[in-house]
């Protein structure tokens, strides 16, 4: 307000100042005399009908500087007044606007509060409705669950009823099947009992026969021991006779060295008239040449008792096959030694052949057992396929597994015996080659020595050969015994079951 009063006072003073020169100018215009006609102040353009207000006259001639300044100041004063009026109007409008804004704010606040109140009420109402809806949904879910539970109960009851009916039907069928199965099993049991009775009778007969055979074996062992004792006595007598004969032959050789020329002129039949063995009695047999019996047979038969009986029969009936060559043969020792040296190739074969025969017999028995096991395996598989119950099938499967294990063990035994047989064949071939080489060397050495030396050392070398030959068969029999022991050890080392 103070600013407005100050501006009004300044405007009044400025207007009074401007009014005074305007008055003076008017007086000057009026009193001045000019030849020009005055320009109409209300018509700015001559050729147009445009008119101006008398408050703003136009002058046709140029004004002076002071007058121009006064007009400019007047124009400025008018502009200032207009601006003041506009400012006042603007202030009033601002005041009205501020009032209106305050009122509008109040109205807006009231409306906002009303809206918030209405929203709160609506939210509360909506929450109540939502809670009611949730409760209704929960009730619906509970009802649905109850319905599903009731349906499940009904289905379960129906399933139980059907299962009970099916069980009853299956039990009836099983009863009928069990009755038929029991009847078949009873029939099988009757057959098995009959077979068992037959087997027990056969076993009793076999036991009786075994007892009789054992008694016979004991008697035969006693007889064999007696024969061995008697043979030992005879062997000792034979050795004494041999020593006496060797003494006689040495004396004959010493006399023959003195009369070499006479002996050369005489026929060769008379030279060895005293060195011959006569037809000696047959009881002079060599026990080292007898076949060795070690629990298994050397002949094609598998019965040990039969083999022992055969040997004793040969001994009783004076078989020349079991006697020493020096006792039975009428050929001199020198000729026997030469013949034995020449036939050394053939003497190697019998023990190896006997071992091979025994191994082939063992292989045959093992293969027979394996074939029987394979037949049992087929029968068990058929029974497993035809078994009606699960328990019987399990028992049969257990038996089949045990049978498979035994078959594997039997196959291992067969492979071991075959390997050992191949090794023996290789060893026999190597031995034959070595003995052939040794015999060739000995024959060459004897030929060289016979070409260089006289007849006396030749007879001595033949005597040495004759001394070496009698124990050769016993050594071969010992080698056969060792081979059999190695076979037994190789078969027993795996701790396998032989019978099934």
From Swiss-Prot:
Assembly behavior = Interacts with FGF2 and RAP80. Does not interact with FGF1 or FGF2 isoform 24 kDa. Homodimer and homooligomer. Interacts with microtubules.
Compositionally biased intervals (Low complexity): 1-16
Q: What is known of its domains?
A: The C-terminal region mediates the interaction with microtubules and is able to nucleate and bundles microtubules in vitro. The centrosome localization domain (CLD) region mediates the localization to centrosomes and homooligomerization.
What function does the entry list? Answer: Centrosomal protein which may be required for microtubule attachment to centrosomes. May act by forming ring-like structures around microtubules. Mediates nuclear translocation and mitogenic activity of the internalized growth factor FGF2.
Expression by tissue: Ubiquitous (at protein level). Expressed in testis, predominantly in round spermatids. Low expression is detected in other tissues.
| InterPro entries in the record | Centrosomal_MT-associated (IPR051756), Cep57_CLD (IPR025913), Cep57_MT-bd_dom (IPR024957)
Query: Which protein is depicted?
Result: Centrosomal protein of 57 kDa
Q: Tell me which stretches of the chain form a coiled coil.
A: 63-242, 389-449
Gene Ontology process terms (BP): fibroblast growth factor receptor signaling pathway; protein homooligomerization; spermatid development
Protein family per UniProt: Belongs to the translokin family.
Any one Gene Ontology molecular-function term assigned to this protein's record: protein homodimerization activity
Biased composition, Basic and acidic residues: where in the chain? 432-444, 461-475
Q: Where is the composition biased (Polar residues)?
A: 22-35
Main localization category: nucleus
Ranges where the record places region Mediates interaction with microtubules? 278-491
Keyword Nucleus on entry = yes
Q: Which cysteines share a disulfide bond?
A: none
- Modification Phosphoserine occurs at: 53
Q: Where is this region: centrosome localization domain (CLD)?
A: 58-239
